[in-house]
């Protein structure tokens, strides 16, 4: 990993000012354009148009083209879903159940807090869950049951009436059993074997098989992200997720092995993942770098890890923790680890992060699977203005206005005066009539 020294150098390297198109990595975009013969955004817009026009036929056609799965129907039957639990190792099923209980407890606690606020606002505001949401879970060659739990359980706890899940099938046309088992545990209502931009379009506009939803949540590749961007406004979305990232703030007391293991775990995601260590200790920087370089060769995904660390890995040595915290706030990482002495006292200084992990046992991996908060987090600096997926993503508020005689007497003339000033005479008249 590259090691740099000094706040100014670190600030320059960690600046995101030139990363406005974070989910459109130029290398990836150029390669995709070469392979497709068209810009990815144009390709996605074409897929969306086809799905709007041809419905299920287009979704099935693109599933055959991109996933090599020749399906006659898109929906996964309930017998197949119910059987999935018996097809996975008991240890995995129990682990998924434990993770689900943690996620459920966390979001139930949040729900209670949200509903208490609603009680305080009684008579002024209503809170209502969304009717139907669509969850996108990556699939195909890999499977991610954890993402099923992390997106579906917050929706279920919020009171969403119907949860639809889409995920790409394998070439055999099947959804992996762990994904189906997780969906059953989380309370997903319906599952469809499709992915990519075609699945997002189907959720946004509806087809004969796939119902139109109110909101689409979940991470995906560049095509999924561009499709979510394109349909926003027709439906709501949770955000535009880019490559995963971790930023570790560490002092001389930090465990170098722990720092290195979290860096390797992050780099293991994909070649675009970012792994950053900011430390006040030159000695720790060198030890972590040595461990990472020696262990990278022993990992099964060594090629991905090496490319990720080469392109997006960084160690910065700064003078003090205050400088490190300032850099962390500037970067607004998806995952922020505080591996420093008395780490809890620095929580109040953190303004921008998707999720904060503090205490030396708090590996990001715990947040990925079992800690409780959703692992669907803002990336690429969007933690400056957006939040992790949670209960509030699946509810909406309706304001209430009640006006009695005292209210109209007190406020009516002011409303009419403002309306007249804006040239809206009928507005003014609607109020003045009530003052008669």
UniProtKB/Swiss-Prot annotation:
InterPro entries: Ald_DH/histidinol_DH, Histidinol_DH_CS, Histidinol_DH_monofunct, Hstdl_DH. Binds 1 zinc ion per subunit. The active site is at 334 (proton acceptor), 335 (proton acceptor). GO terms for biological process: L-histidine biosynthetic process. GO terms for cellular component: cytosol. GO terms for molecular function: histidinol dehydrogenase activity; NAD binding; zinc ion binding. Substrate binds at residues 244, 266, 269, 335, 368, 422, 427. Its EC number is 1.1.1.23. Catalyzes the sequential NAD-dependent oxidations of L-histidinol to L-histidinaldehyde and then to L-histidine. This is Histidinol dehydrogenase. The lineage of its organism: Bacteria, Bacillati, Chloroflexota, Dehalococcoidia, Dehalococcoidales.
């Amino acid at each position: 990993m590259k090691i740099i020294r000094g706040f100014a150098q670190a600030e320059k390297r960690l600046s995101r000012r030139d990363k406005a198109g974070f989910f459109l990595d130029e290398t990836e975009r150029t390669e995709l354009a070469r392979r497709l013969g068209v810009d990815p955004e144009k390709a996605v817009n074409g897929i969306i148009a086809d799905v709007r026009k041809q419905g299920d036929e287009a979704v099935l056609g693109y599933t055959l083209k991109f996933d090599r799965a020749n399906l006659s129907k898109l929906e996964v039957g309930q017998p197949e879903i119910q059987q999935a639990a018996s097809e996975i190792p008991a240890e995995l099923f129990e682990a998924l159940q434990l993770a689900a209980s943690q996620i459920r407890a966390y979001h139930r606690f949040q729900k209670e807090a949200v509903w208490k606020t609603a009680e305080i606002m009684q008579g002024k505001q209503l809170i209502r869950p969304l009717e139907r949401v669509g969850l996108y879970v990556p699939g195909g060659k890999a499977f991610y049951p954890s993402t099923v739990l992390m997106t579906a359980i917050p929706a279920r706890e919020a009171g969403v009436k119907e949860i639809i899940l889409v995920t790409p099938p394998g070439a055999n046309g099947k959804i992996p059993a762990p994904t189906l088992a997780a969906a059953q545990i989380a309370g997903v209502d319906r599952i469809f074997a499709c992915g990519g931009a075609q699945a997002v379009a189907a959720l946004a506009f509806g087809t004969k098989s796939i119902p139109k939803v109110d909101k689409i949540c979940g991470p995906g590749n560049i095509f999924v992200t561009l499709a979510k961007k394109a349909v926003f406004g027709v439906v709501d979305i949770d955000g535009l997720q880019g490559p995963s990232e971790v930023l570790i703030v560490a002092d001389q007391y930090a465990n170098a092995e722990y720092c290195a293991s979290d860096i390797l775990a992050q780099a293991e995601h994909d070649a675009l993942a970012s792994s950053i260590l900011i430390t006040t200790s030159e000695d720790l920087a060198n030890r972590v770098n040595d461990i990472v370089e020696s262990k990278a060769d022993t990992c099964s995904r060594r090629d991905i890890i090496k490319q990720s660390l080469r392109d997006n890995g960084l160690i910065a040595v700064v003078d003090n923790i205050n400088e490190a915290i300032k850099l962390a706030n500037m970067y607004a990482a998806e995952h922020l680890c505080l591996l420093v002495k008395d780490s809890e006292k620095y929580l109040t200084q953190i303004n921008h992060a998707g999720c904060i992990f503090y205490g030396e046992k708090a590996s990001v991996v715990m947040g990925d699977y079992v800690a409780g908060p959703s692992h669907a987090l803002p990336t690429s600096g969007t933690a400056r203005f957006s939040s992790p997926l949670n209960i509030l993503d699946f509810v909406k508020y309706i304001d209430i206005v009640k006006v009695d005689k005292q209210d109209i007497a007190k406020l009516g003339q002011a409303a009419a005066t403002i309306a007249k000033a804006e040239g809206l005479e009928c507005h003014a008249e609607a109020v003045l009539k009530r003052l008669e």
